[in-house]
A protein has these predicted regions:
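Contiguous transmembrane helix-bundle modules in multi-pass membrane proteins
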Residues: 1-30, 39-142, 151, 155-242
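Glycine-centered flexible beta-alpha turn that most often forms the glycine-rich phosphate-binding loop
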Residues: 36
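Glycine-rich, often proline-containing surface loops adjacent to acidic residues and nearby aromatics
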Residues: 145
Length: 242
């Protein structure tokens, strides 16, 4: 009975959250139908839904499986002295709550992360339908179409990945903290081998994504507003460019 009640309130919450979007969507459909451009509406809607489902599912998988892996870490680990340690409930009390809430919370986060990614549908649609301009920029020797069609989509993807990985690292570290895989006591921070390896892998992926972001930032020099003229100046090229 409790499970059915929880499911009912969860569904009601989703209906309240997405009701406004459904009304707006229906209004747009009526307008496009009136002017005879329903094919454009259905094409963009299909692309948005596809993006939302793909990125929402990826976000769900990131959160769910990493937290699940942390929650299933071995429990037979040594405990630090409790004099200055963080006061937390025992893993035996936390485990049933984590197991009960993990799936619905991960689904809910995925439902919010998917539409956020889908809001960049125009950039991604241009990315998949880019055409060359036949003119290269003088600094990086890239076709101008890269800056019009590809760079905005790559920047949006980078921002989504940094947010998703950052939240995953925080959720995973907090789970290890609850299960005593990460502890803080008088002798400093203690991590089990399982927690250390898991978190280091996530941080390594995060840093790789950040490195990709710094690489993308170099192309932003062409939009630099420093100096007397708009674009990459002498200082940008010889001082700021890696």
């Amino acid at each position: 009975m409790k499970k059915l009640t929880g499911l009912f309130f969860f569904v009601v919450f989703l209906l309240i959250v997405f009701f406004g979007q459904a009304i707006s969507l229906y209004t747009d459909w009526l307008w496009f139908q009136e002017v005879g451009y329903t094919q454009i509406f259905t094409t963009t809607l299909t692309f948005k839904l596809t993006l939302g489902l793909v990125f929402g599912a990826l976000f769900f998988l990131l959160i769910y499986f990493n937290v699940k892996l942390a929650a299933h870490a071995p429990r037979n680990i040594r405990f630090l002295e409790q004099e200055n340690a963080i006061e937390l409930p025992s893993p035996e009390l936390v485990d049933p709550l984590i197991q009960r809430l993990l799936l619905p919370v991960a689904i809910l986060l995925g439902l919010f992360a998917g539409p956020q990614a889908a809001s960049h549908w125009q950039s991604l649609l241009l990315f998949f339908n880019s055409v060359p301009f036949g003119i290269e920029d003088p600094l990086f020797s890239r076709d101008i179409s890269f800056y019009v069609f590809r760079l905005p989509a790559l920047t949006a993807l980078y921002n989504w990945l940094t947010f998703s990985l950052g939240l995953t690292i925080l959720a995973t570290a907090f789970t290890y903290l609850l299960y005593r895989g990460v502890q803080y006591g008088p002798r400093g921070l203690f991590l089990t081998d399982r927690a250390k390896g898991h978190l280091l892998c996530l941080v390594a992926v995060f840093l790789l994504v950040k490195a990709g972001g710094y690489y993308l930032d170099t192309f932003e020099l062409l939009y630099s507003s420093r100096g007397a003229a708009f674009g990459a100046t002498y200082a940008d090229v010889y001082a700021n460019l890696p």
